[in-house]
Amino acid sequence: MPHTIPTNRSDIEWRNESTQKSPKQAVYIQEAGAAEILKNAHAQTATVWTGDFHNAKQVLAAMKKRIRRPSEKKKGASADIQTAFHAHRMKQAQQSHLLNMLAVEIQPNFQLDNARSPDIYAALRDVYDTPNDKPFLLPLNQLLGFIGAHEWNKKGIDIPQLDGKIHVPFGVFSPLRGEYLDLIAQAPLAPNIQTAFDIGTGSGVIAAILAKRGIPNIIATDTNPKAIACATANLERLGLDKAVNIQLIDLFPESCADLIVCNPPWLPAKPTSAIETALYDPNHAMLTAFLNGVRKHLNPNGEAWLIISDLAEHLHLRDKDFLNQCFQTASLNVVDILKTKPQHKKAIDESDPLAFARNKETTYLYRLKAI
């Protein structure tokens, strides 16, 4: 969030797309080593790099190497798995905070003055929409993330179920995990299905798959304006926009449907940035709101599809019977369960601190009907 901080030159706006606290102050330095910048960071002082851009990237890499050295403590899963998860997230947050203390000054109209700096205009337009008329400070690590996201957006993500690509800008969750899309493409549809809702559409990929499967009238909803714009562009690009009406609303439209699909965030924890709201759902708020509200929006004999993994159970963040209790409370009956194993890199990375849970993870599609 924007916040004005003092520097050794003048007060200036500090921007950070996470929920981290702004530094107390910042100092402009031509060049410095990783040790000096980290020392400043521990004192809540940001370092603004005014020298060569490529040198700044090298120093940032050195900072990452320093703070991500393996712990001296015995490796392996904690006896308290839930504690291990929260400790992992805390460590990630602390490391991110330190890395974000190396910043650059963004000149008006999204420009950089640093030597050998790239053109960042398009990448920052994806994030902020309106170009700046005054300079501001931005963590270098975040800037590099914005540039990477912009390149991914241009390239697009191949979606085999669509025989096409989905393009996702910064601020919208990217469907890099394809296993749940297979479930949506394979789950049986009722004969003569006419209407469907995609709740929390994000990039629009689920709505697109439903349209590709022949459902003629789909409403896709989201509360994120960036997601609405993203989904709209993707469906137009895929030639599926005539079948899908995209609405900026929370959860359900006022009408009813034959099929209602939701892929809520899978982990009940607090997000630390806007993009993490697609990953973390405090107290399973969206999950329970969907289940408790979906019944009254289903047409007679209609189905609700819930896509969710059991990672939260393996991390001891959710009881194994939690979902069944939610289904009972919402007067929903499970008529079928489809499942698959994740294929993404973290699922098979034994060096991942949460590998002990990820290698047990299964992704499910629950087909639900009103009792």
Which residues does each PLM region occupy?
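Class I S-adenosyl-L-methionine
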Residues: 324-371
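Glycine-rich S-adenosyl-L-methionine
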Residues: 275-299
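N-terminal auxiliary segments of SAM/dcSAM-dependent transferases
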Residues: 2-33, 37-157
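Conserved beta-strand signature within the Rossmann-like core of class I S-adenosyl-L-methionine
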Residues: 301-309
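Short, electropositive alpha-helical surface patch
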Residues: 312-330
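SAM-dependent Rossmann-like transferase core, predominantly class I methyltransferases
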Residues: 119-195, 199-209, 358-360
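Conserved SAM/SAH cofactor-binding pocket of Class I
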Residues: 177-264, 268-272
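Short "lid" loop at the C-terminus of a central beta-strand within the Rossmann-like core
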Residues: 266-267, 284, 309-314
